[in-house]
C-alpha cells in the first residue's frame, strides 16, 4: 500500500535524486530545499515499504494554486501513485480555499496530460519554448 505524507527535510535528497530519473531538466537540490521551506508550498511524498517512489508540490497563493512539480519513479508508474499524489494536492488546495489550480506540462507528456484531464483540467494556453530544450508546455487549469 502506498503511503502519502507531508515532505520532511530529510526527504529532499531522495526527491532530488528521483527528479533526475524523471526529468531531462530537473530541479536542483537547492530548488527542493527552497520549496520545503516556502510558506506557500506544500510537498507530499509517496512511499512504498519505506521507499520514496513519488512526490508532488503545490504552491498556494490566495485563491490560486500551481502544481509546481509531480513525479513518480519509472518503476512505479501506472499503479495509481501519481493519481493519489494529485488527489491529495487538490484536497489540500480545496481545504485552503483555492478556487483555481494551474499547471504546466510538456506537450509530449501524454500520460500526464491524460491524468490531468481525468481530474477535469483543461488546456487554456500554450507556452512556447517553455522548457530549456525548447519544447512547448500546455498551461492547464482546473476550477475547484
Feature names for model-found ranges:
Residues 2-4:
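Extreme N-terminal starter segment of soluble prokaryotic enzymes
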Residues 99, 106-113, 129-144:
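C-terminal "cap" of GNAT-fold acetyltransferases
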Residues 6-75, 86-88, 92, 96, ...:
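Acetyl-CoA-dependent GNAT
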Residues 116, 121, 140:
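Conserved active-site tyrosine of GNAT-family acetyltransferases
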Residues 73-75, 79, 107-109:
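Active-site acidic-Proline motif in GNAT/NAT acetyltransferases
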Amino acid at each position: 500500500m502506498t503511503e502519502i505524507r507531508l515532505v520532511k527535510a530529510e526527504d529532499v535528497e531522495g526527491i532530488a535524486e528521483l527528479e533526475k530519473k524523471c526529468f531531462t531538466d530537473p530541479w536542483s537540490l537547492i530548488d527542493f530545499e527552497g520549496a520545503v521551506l516556502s510558506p506557500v508550498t506544500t510537498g507530499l511524498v509517496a512511499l512504498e515499504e519505506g521507499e520514496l517512489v513519488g512526490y508532488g508540490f503545490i504552491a498556494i497563493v490566495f485563491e490560486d494554486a500551481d502544481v509546481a512539480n509531480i513525479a513518480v519513479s519509472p518503476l512505479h508508474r501506472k499503479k495509481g501513485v501519481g493519481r493519489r499524489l494529485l488527489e491529495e494536492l487538490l484536497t489540500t488546495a480545496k481545504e485552503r480555499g483555492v478556487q483555481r489550480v494551474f499547471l504546466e506540462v510538456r506537450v509530449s507528456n501524454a500520460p500526464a496530460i491524460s491524468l490531468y484531464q481525468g481530474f477535469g483540467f483543461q488546456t487554456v494556453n500554450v507556452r512556447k519554448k517553455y522548457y530549456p530544450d525548447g519544447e512547448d508546455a500546455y498551461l492547464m487549469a482546473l476550477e475547484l
